[in-house]
Amino acid sequence: MGLIQLQNKTGWMLVEPVLKCNHNDVMKEDIRPDTPQPCPVARSLDVIGDRWSLLIVRDAFDGISRFGDFQRSLGAARNILADRLRRLVEAGILETRPAAEGSAYLEYVLTAQGLELFPVIVALRQWGEGHLFAPGEAHSLLLDRQTGLPVAPMLPRGGDGRALLPGQTVVQKID
């Protein structure tokens, strides 16, 4: 397989593609539900890969915790929202707690496992900010509360701290 060109904010670069997962072999529709996915990306998508689940997680990071508030923010049908919240609780991404003021309402809050999705949400947001809006088009921007400055771009880093590009990584199977 030859080099491919990828564009980033600084221009074009040549990278050698590295096969991460054979996506044709792990399409969810093509395998039985009880068959474990061989790829961490595929397994992650099984848990949080649909639109509503990721948006629920995004809203939870933004402080939303009640069913009605999720519904107002997302505009999702009640049955779909209830299903996704249930799945996220079952997956250990969210947990339910009694509402703070002691009412009969439940709140959905991120677990430690759910909090680890913050870099995923930030990376998706930054990619969207950089690629899905026309110049001058209004959109939200993630800012550092302390400085008021935009959050620095998310970059994978090596164990020594240097930024890594796609051609500088390799997937190794662990048995």
What are the functions of these language-model segments?
Residues 67, 71-99, 103:
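Canonical helix-turn-helix DNA-binding module
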Residues 44, 54, 91, 120-131:
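Alpha-helical linker/hinge and terminal dimerization helices associated
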Residues 39-80:
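N-terminal helix-turn-helix DNA-binding core of bacterial DNA-binding proteins
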Residues 49, 100-121:
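Basic, amphipathic "hinge/linker" alpha-helix immediately C-terminal to the N-terminal HTH DNA-binding motif
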Residues 23-45:
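Short, Lys/Arg-enriched N-terminal segment that forms or immediately precedes the first helix
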Residues 8-28, 71, 76-86:
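Membrane-interacting alpha-helical segments
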Residues 2-25, 122, 126-175:
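C-terminal regulatory/oligomerization modules of transcriptional regulators
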